[in-house]
Design a protein with these regions (language model features):
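Replace the tail clause
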Residues: 1-330
Length: 330
């Protein structure tokens, strides 16, 4: 897996003899590769979101023998996971009928959710779209872009929906929301300021520190959103990010895969360390670029002695485009 916390849980728990013994004693354990079986992943991710209000990977689901979920979560540290295994085993032994009843109810709710809007047909009324957009705009973070709080995932589908709403209604609020979020992500640490392409999500509300894995589907969807924004408005940042994201997809995920295929993701970890290929210190910049250029780059990209990530390292950000002409005149 590309996900950092998937690596952590695999090492802490699944490779641990004590945890393995507890799992094998009380459960039939199945590990699903979501890239090979996205259909299975989608079913249990819907259950995880429905039961917890959020989703993510690693995804941990406990099922009845017929495959119906009754308890779901994501990452658990070893001690908490051992406690959870014990509690689930005890509950299954002593209250099995209640668990099965709950799982039946959850399965019924998931089937209802999957059936779509009540009375829905091929046409969606404009009024329904307007109400949906109004609800989305109420949730936007007007200070940092995006919708809701941390962690923040790139809202590619919402950006595309807002652009389509703008095309239909010429709503300035919809376009402003796209510009606010598009700018914030493209200038933040979630976007690779050197190599192009977006990371999976931001752990904070200001798009500063990402979870560093890069996913094919995220970047394909964001390419579409930024290209749509650029085509409709001519915004130079949108044009630049769309071009860089396309180049990242072709060079990093396309050229290194078999013919006519793409690599599905880039790992968050390198040499066992999260994000090590994406973070910098002021000293590293001066070592690579020299004293003057290194200090200038640190200022441009927000690289400080204190750092924004771990151990005094900083994720590159680009709060404003550099004045290259003034730099050359020095």
């Amino acid at each position: 897996p590309a996900c950092h916390w998937c690596h952590v849980m695999a090492h802490e728990s699944f490779d641990d003899d004590e945890v393995a013994a507890a799992m094998n004693a009380g459960f039939v354990c199945i590990k699903v590769d979501r890239e090979e079986r996205p259909d299975i992943d989608a079913v249990y991710m819907n259950a995880t979101v429905a039961l917890t209000g959020q989703g993510g990977w690693p995804m941990t689901c406990f099922l009845t023998p017929n495959g119906r979920p009754f308890f779901c979560g994501t990452y658990y540290p070893k001690a908490a996971f051992l406690q959870l295994l014990s509690a689930i085993s005890e509950t299954w032994r002593e209250r099995r009928a209640e668990v099965e009843q709950a799982s039946d109810h959850i399965a019924a709710e998931l089937r209802s959710m999957a059936s779509g809007l009540p009375g829905g047909g091929p046409e969606v009324a404009p009024e329904l779209c307007d109400d949906a957009v109004a609800g989305v705009l109420r949730e936007q973070d007007t200070a940092h872009g995006g919708f809701g709080g941390a962690p923040k995932f790139p809202p590619s589908a919402l950006l595309e929906a807002l652009m389509r709403h703008y095309e239909r209604t010429r709503s300035p609020a919809a376009l402003e929301a796209v510009a606010r979020t598009g700018n914030a992500m493209a200038r933040g640490g979630i976007y690779d300021q050197l190599g192009g392409g977006f990371a999976r999500y931001s752990v904070d509300g200001a798009w500063v520190v990402p979870h560093f894995e890069k996913m094919l589907y995220d970047n394909a969807l964001l390419l579409r959103a930024y290209a749509h924004w650029a085509r409709r408005t001519g915004d130079p940042l949108a044009r630049r990010v769309a071009a860089q994201t396309a180049r990242f997809l072709l060079d990093e995920l396309g050229s290194k895969a078999p013919a006519d295929m793409f690599t599905s993701s880039l790992d968050a970890d390198a040499d066992g360390r999260e994000g090590s290929t994406y973070v910098w210190t002021p000293v590293q910049l001066t070592e690579v670029l020299g004293g003057d250029d290194g200090r200038w780059a640190a200022e441009v990209f927000g690289v400080t002695e204190a750092g924004t990530f771990e151990h005094g390292t900083s994720v590159l950000q680009l709060p404003a485009d550099p004045d290259d002409a003034a730099r050359l005149d020095r």
